[in-house]
From Swiss-Prot:
This is Histone H2B. Residues 1-32 are annotated as: Disordered. InterPro entries: Histone-fold, Histone_H2A/H2B/H3, Histone_H2B, HISTONE_H2B_site. Keywords: Chromosome, DNA-binding, Glycoprotein, Isopeptide bond, Methylation, Nucleosome core, Nucleus, Ubl conjugation. PANTHER family: HISTONE H2B (PTHR23428). The keyword DNA-binding applies. The keyword Glycoprotein applies. Residues 9-32 have a biased composition (Basic residues). GO terms for molecular function: DNA binding; protein heterodimerization activity; protein-containing complex binding; structural constituent of chromatin. Core component of nucleosome. Nucleosomes wrap and compact DNA into chromatin, limiting DNA accessibility to the cellular machineries which require DNA as a template. Histones thereby play a central role in transcription regulation, DNA repair, DNA replication and chromosomal stability. DNA accessibility is regulated via a complex set of post-translational modifications of histones, also called histone code, and nucleosome remodeling. Belongs to the histone H2B family. There is a cross-link at K118 (Glycyl lysine isopeptide (Lys-Gly) (interchain with G-Cter in ubiquitin)). The nucleosome is a histone octamer containing two molecules each of H2A, H2B, H3 and H4 assembled in one H3-H4 heterotetramer and two H2A-H2B heterodimers. The octamer wraps approximately 147 bp of DNA.
Length: 123
């Protein structure tokens, strides 16, 4: 009696047949960009012995994207009000001051200034 074909074998055969139909080209998986590696690096700097679940990472990624979009939109609005066609670090700084509350804005501005200084000095 011959062995029964497993579900895995059937799936492999189906995928091979599909690849043959599409002109023998394997479809490359589309790259999904995220901030997860940077969030993980910051987590390890702050709490070296703490991990993060994929759900929590997804939430953090959404949070970073949301804040990025808010700052970009506010900076764009500020540039438009002042009839400027370029968003500079000044617009970003003002947008951060407008969007973030009190002490958080002060820390964000100082960290941003530090990052820009480090970048310009390394050039």
């Amino acid at each position: 009696m011959p062995p029964k074909p497993s579900a895995k074998g059937a799936k492999k055969a189906a995928s091979k047949a599909k690849a043959a139909r599409t002109g023998d080209k394997k479809r490359r998986k589309r790259r999904k960009e995220s901030y997860s590696i940077y969030i993980y690096k910051v987590l390890k700097q702050v709490h070296p012995d703490t991990g993060i679940s994929s759900k929590a990472m997804s939430i953090m990624n959404s949070f970073v994207n949301d804040i990025f979009e808010r700052i970009a939109a506010e900076a764009s609005r500020l540039a438009h009000y002042n009839r400027r066609s370029t968003i500079t670090s000044r617009e970003i700084q003002t947008a951060v001051r407008l969007l973030l509350p009190g002490e958080l804005a002060k820390h964000a501005v100082s960290e941003g200034t530090k990052a820009v200084t480090k970048y310009t000095s390394s050039k």
